């Protein structure tokens, strides 16, 4: 794997390989989301429909994934077409530059909501193009009901608590089936989910990604 535009940086816990977001098109390790067939894309941080309430990407082109994650996404598309014809993956976030991760972290300063945002000092896996946020849309293009919204920072969003939510009625069986379908498509394709966000999926082990992959600034 090649690193483009290496930048030295102080105050980092790992010897990150860094690249400016503006240079990403020149790096062959990354693929545009538009090159992945049969997905829908609505990058929520490129608009105001997010927990910060403003466009965080501006002129930055963030519709990219590392080619390994893009290949996993393609596998998920194939699996979903076979097992739930007419349904598609809707990508809500993919590459997230480190400078944007800092803004998210700072926005939640002093709150207990920081559990939902990776500490920039460690590096978000989004910033390596190795994570994505996604949901599903039906054949009519409507988002499936997952029981909580994207970036909803409540316990209803926690996959590890789904059994409890089903028992109390906080999550319906249909909502749970929708989450299971999303997880099945992505986790059978090489991604891993996390405990507190049903929409978030990562490729490979975090420490390996942070040590070996290019972080986009």
Question: At which residue positions do the language-model features occur?
Answer:
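Extracytoplasmic cell-surface/polysaccharide-interacting catalytic and binding patches
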Residues: 1-94, 104-196, 204-217
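Segments that shape or occlude catalytic/ligand-binding pockets
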Residues: 97
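Aromatic-lined carbohydrate-binding/catalytic grooves of carbohydrate-active enzymes
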Residues: 101
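Conserved metal-phosphate-binding beta-hairpin within the catalytic cores
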Residues: 201
């Amino acid at each position: 794997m090649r690193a483009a535009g290496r930048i030295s940086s102080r105050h980092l816990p790992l010897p990150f390989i860094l690249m400016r977001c503006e240079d990403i098109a020149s790096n062959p390790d990354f693929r545009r989301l538009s090159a992945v067939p049969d997905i829908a894309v609505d990058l929520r941080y490129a608009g105001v429909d997010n927990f910060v309430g403003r466009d965080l990407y501006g002129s930055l082109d963030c519709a990219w994934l590392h080619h390994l994650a893009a290949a996993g996404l393609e596998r998920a598309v194939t699996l979903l077409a076979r097992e739930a014809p007419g349904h598609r993956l809707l990508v809500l976030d993919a590459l997230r530059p480190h400078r944007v991760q800092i803004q998210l972290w700072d926005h939640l300063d002093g709150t207990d909501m920081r559990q939902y945002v990776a500490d920039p000092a460690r590096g978000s896996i989004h910033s390596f193009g190795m994570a994505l946020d996604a949901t599903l849309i039906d054949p009519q293009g409507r988002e499936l009901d997952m029981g909580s919204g994207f970036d909803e920072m409540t316990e209803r969003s926690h996959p590890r608590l789904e059994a409890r939510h089903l028992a109390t009625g906080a999550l319906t069986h249909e909502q749970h089936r929708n989450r299971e379908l999303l997880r099945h498509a992505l986790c059978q394709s090489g991604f891993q989910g996390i405990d507190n966000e049903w929409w978030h999926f990562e490729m490979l082990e975090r420490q390996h990604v942070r040590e070996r992959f290019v972080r986009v600034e």
